[in-house]
Structures are given as C-alpha cells and as structure tokens.
Amino acid sequence: AEIWAEDLPAETTLLQKLASTFALVDPRAAELVALCAGPRDALIAPSMPWLMDSSVDPFEAHNLRLLYGRWLVHEAMYDESLVYLASLEPKDVVAPATLLFFQGVAYHALVEKEKGLAVLRRLLDGAEQSPRRYAAVARLMQEDLDGVEPDTLHHIARRMDDIHRRLDLGRAGPKVRGIEDGVIDSLDKLIKRLEDQQQQQSGGGGGGIQSGAP
C-alpha cells in the first residue's frame, strides 16, 4: 500500500511502481527490478526467458519486458532490448509512450529507418499525451532518420558508430562482420559514384574545347 500512497504518477513512475508491486509477490520480478535499478556489471545482458513464457500473466510479463527493455536501451544494448520490446504494443503496457519512445531509440541507434520512423510517427501522433521530453527527442530522431539514405556518408557514419558500440560491448561475431561488410560495400559504391562523376565532369569539359589547328 505504501508504494501506491501518492497520487497517480506520470506513466514512467507508474511503470516503476507497478514493477515494484510485482516484486513484492514474485521473486523473479524482484531480481529484475534490482537489476534495472543500477548499471550493468557485465558485457552480456542477463537472459530473462521467463518474461516470454506464456504461462506468466501477460500484464506482468508485458510491463516487466518494457522495464527490462528500457534498461537495456539505457545500457546501449539495442539488439537485446528489441528482443523484449519489438513485439509489444502500446495497449499491452501502462506506459505506452515510453514503449514507443524506447522502441524508437533502439531502431534509431541501429539505423533501422522504416521501423524507426513508423514507431516515432505513432508516438508523435499522440504527442499531447506523451512526456514533452519524449516528443522533443522523437522529433530529432525522426528528422535524423528521414535524412538517412542508403550508401551515403551519413548512412556509412551511422553504421560505423554502431560497429564501435558493438565492439565496446565485446561483440565481434557474424552480426558485426556483416555490418562491416555492408559498410565496405557502401564505401565501394560511394567511391564508384564519385569516380563516375569526376569522369563525366572531365569528359564534359574536354568536349567543349575547340582545336585551334587549321
């Protein structure tokens, strides 16, 4: 009862208080809440398969998945966060704007343009019900993703940032190598385009020179 003694809080506080309520009766929830209360102390995110177990009450599982996914985003573990967040819908949780915001942050960080823009549009469509800071940051992420075009310097730079983040987390497997291969392919395409443009400009300039010989 003490947890709920205050007036109805904002949705982010509501999520935290709901999680604390689950923790009073479920030791697994208590462990998760304790984990999410501090920074990570390992490069590998703890697996929480029980959150995806259909035998767990959906109301508890969905909201704790949001709590855990939000924490994973804060820890820059974006792929891991989407394991828990991607399939959730706003109607599944007590903090719908928080869900859409952190889905958007993860997709933005991973440069998944279409998925990112889709969830950010949904968040901004209900901006009047969302925390102002969510709406403000969502507009910035939307503008950034709108400007991402395949094989441009912006796109290449964003993916290189993602590679550095993954390496900082100790990730060096097939996923990272695949992103690295994609960056190299994009660089090759960009260089080829620039070379073609230079050749066209040189050819156009050369074609306009008239010989002075009789």
Regions picked out by a protein language model, each given a short descriptive name:
Residues 1-214:
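Mature extracytoplasmic or organellar-lumen-exposed domains after removal of signal/transit peptides
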